[in-house]
Amino acid sequence: PATEGQFGKDITMESWRQAVKKVGFEDLIEAGLGGDMTTCSEAEEWLEAYRNGEKKTTSCCPGFVNMIRKHYPDLADMISTTVSPMCAVSRMIKAKDPDAVTVFVGPCVAKKSEVADQKIEGNADYALNYNEILAIMKAKDVELEPAENTYQDSTIFGKFYGNSGGVTDSVLEYMKETEQNEDIKVCKANGAAECKKALMFLQRGRLPEDFIEGMA
């Protein structure tokens, strides 16, 4: 979902779909669909933890997860077990075609470390940042061209995952729609500094909120 709007208002998901097919990919599926898929799982996990008096952190940002595992290993058990939207979409594709090779494209370099983690079954096989996919397109003489925004896989809530606080917005909306209106409070940490501060409070038992949404 972070791809929309990054290259001008006229460059849509359909623009990207046409371009990647020209360079040799079979098709494009929006990672925001994975946001829709994982929101349900994330919400149920949050609700269970909340009702048990436990605190949790989100798991969709690999930079944040790496920060916890490296610098706050005692908090690793608090990381949500819900897979990232990237992984959810990859698993869906591979369920339909076990021989498919899946490639994630986005702005986050840390996605490469998530791909390299072989413990995550069914995850994307490769991750490319924007510079890399644009270099491939340039080598193939392919350009992103304006196209009508007709190609959408995800809802607006799946697209929220591309913004800080988006996971929280999606999960709380899901809870509202399913009439599970618990008074859950979330610390929205955007950037490494805010993530470190939130984790320090959690580590010391001083985090007032129930969950941390971390986007490092």
Locations of regions flagged by a protein language model:
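Iron-sulfur-associated redox domains of electron-transfer enzymes in respiratory
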Residues: P1-A216
